Amino acid sequence: MGRSLKKGPFVDAKLLLKIEKMNERNEKHMIKTWSRASTILPVMIGHTIAVHNGKQHVPIYITDQMVGHKLGEFVPTRTFRGHAGSDKKAARR
Protein backbone atom coordinates (compact mmCIF):
# COMPACT_ATOMS: atom_id res chain seq x y z
CA MET A 1 0.00 0.00 0.00
CA GLY A 2 1.25 3.44 -0.86
CA ARG A 3 1.42 6.54 1.25
CA SER A 4 -1.67 8.72 1.55
CA LEU A 5 -1.81 11.51 -1.04
CA LYS A 6 -2.78 14.10 1.55
CA LYS A 7 0.46 13.42 3.45
CA GLY A 8 2.76 13.71 0.45
CA PRO A 9 6.10 11.95 -0.07
CA PHE A 10 8.56 11.60 2.81
CA VAL A 11 11.82 13.49 2.40
CA ASP A 12 14.26 14.23 5.21
CA ALA A 13 13.86 17.94 6.03
CA LYS A 14 17.61 18.64 6.19
CA LEU A 15 18.23 16.86 2.89
CA LEU A 16 15.50 18.86 1.14
CA LEU A 17 16.84 22.10 2.63
CA LYS A 18 20.36 21.34 1.34
CA ILE A 19 19.04 20.52 -2.14
CA GLU A 20 16.99 23.73 -2.31
CA LYS A 21 19.97 25.86 -1.20
CA MET A 22 22.16 24.25 -3.85
CA ASN A 23 19.50 24.88 -6.52
CA GLU A 24 19.36 28.58 -5.56
CA ARG A 25 23.15 28.91 -5.91
CA ASN A 26 23.36 26.64 -9.00
CA GLU A 27 25.87 24.39 -7.22
CA LYS A 28 26.36 20.68 -7.86
CA HIS A 29 28.44 19.00 -5.16
CA MET A 30 27.91 15.71 -3.34
CA ILE A 31 25.56 15.54 -0.35
CA LYS A 32 25.97 12.80 2.27
CA THR A 33 22.82 11.34 3.78
CA TRP A 34 21.79 8.47 6.00
CA SER A 35 18.13 8.89 5.01
CA ARG A 36 17.50 5.86 2.79
CA ALA A 37 13.73 6.25 3.24
CA SER A 38 13.59 9.66 1.53
CA THR A 39 11.65 9.80 -1.72
CA ILE A 40 13.41 11.23 -4.77
CA LEU A 41 11.72 14.45 -5.93
CA PRO A 42 12.06 16.31 -9.25
CA VAL A 43 14.11 19.07 -7.54
CA MET A 44 16.86 16.49 -6.89
CA ILE A 45 17.49 15.69 -10.57
CA GLY A 46 21.10 16.32 -11.57
CA HIS A 47 22.51 16.14 -8.04
CA THR A 48 24.83 13.48 -6.65
CA ILE A 49 23.72 12.13 -3.29
CA ALA A 50 25.92 9.79 -1.24
CA VAL A 51 23.58 7.31 0.47
CA HIS A 52 24.78 5.25 3.44
CA ASN A 53 24.62 1.48 3.01
CA GLY A 54 25.51 0.65 6.62
CA LYS A 55 29.24 0.71 6.02
CA GLN A 56 30.05 3.57 3.65
CA HIS A 57 28.40 6.27 1.57
CA VAL A 58 27.73 5.23 -2.03
CA PRO A 59 27.35 8.13 -4.51
CA ILE A 60 24.27 8.12 -6.73
CA TYR A 61 23.61 10.50 -9.61
CA ILE A 62 19.89 11.32 -9.67
CA THR A 63 18.14 11.06 -13.06
CA ASP A 64 14.55 11.74 -14.07
CA GLN A 65 13.74 8.03 -14.15
CA MET A 66 14.47 7.74 -10.40
CA VAL A 67 11.77 10.24 -9.37
CA GLY A 68 9.22 8.65 -7.04
CA HIS A 69 11.57 5.91 -5.83
CA LYS A 70 13.38 5.81 -2.49
CA LEU A 71 17.10 6.58 -2.15
CA GLY A 72 17.73 3.24 -0.45
CA GLU A 73 16.52 1.30 -3.51
CA PHE A 74 19.67 2.19 -5.42
CA VAL A 75 22.21 1.24 -2.73
CA PRO A 76 22.32 -2.44 -1.73
CA THR A 77 23.09 -3.11 1.93
CA ARG A 78 24.18 -6.72 1.57
CA THR A 79 27.03 -8.18 -0.44
CA PHE A 80 26.60 -11.63 -1.94
CA ARG A 81 29.81 -13.61 -1.45
CA GLY A 82 28.67 -16.73 -3.30
CA HIS A 83 27.50 -20.11 -2.13
CA ALA A 84 29.84 -22.58 -0.52
CA GLY A 85 32.14 -24.17 -3.07
CA SER A 86 32.37 -27.90 -3.57
CA ASP A 87 34.73 -29.58 -1.14
CA LYS A 88 37.08 -31.79 -3.18
CA LYS A 89 37.82 -34.11 -0.24
CA ALA A 90 34.14 -34.79 0.33
CA ALA A 91 33.51 -35.32 -3.39
CA ARG A 92 36.14 -38.11 -3.61
CA ARG A 93 34.60 -40.15 -0.82
Curated annotation (Swiss-Prot):
Kindly state one GO CC term assigned in the UniProt record. cytoplasm
Keyword Transferase included in the entry's annotation: no
Q: An example of a Gene Ontology BP annotation on this entry?
A: translation
Supply the alphabetized keyword list.
Ribonucleoprotein, Ribosomal protein, RNA-binding, rRNA-binding
One GO MF term, please?
Answer: structural constituent of ribosome
- One Pfam family named in its UniProt record: Ribosomal_S19
Question: Its domain of life?
Answer: Bacteria
InterPro entries recorded: Ribosomal_uS19 (IPR002222), Ribosomal_uS19_bac-type (IPR005732), Ribosomal_uS19_CS (IPR020934), Ribosomal_uS19_SF (IPR023575)
Note whether Ribosomal protein occurs among the keywords: yes
Q: Which family does it belong to?
A: Belongs to the universal ribosomal protein uS19 family.
Describe its function: Protein S19 forms a complex with S13 that binds strongly to the 16S ribosomal RNA.
Q: Which HAMAP family match?
A: Ribosomal_uS19
From the Swiss-Prot or TrEMBL record, give the protein name.
Small ribosomal subunit protein uS19
Protein's organism: Synechococcus sp. (strain JA-3-3Ab) (Cyanobacteria bacterium Yellowstone A-Prime)
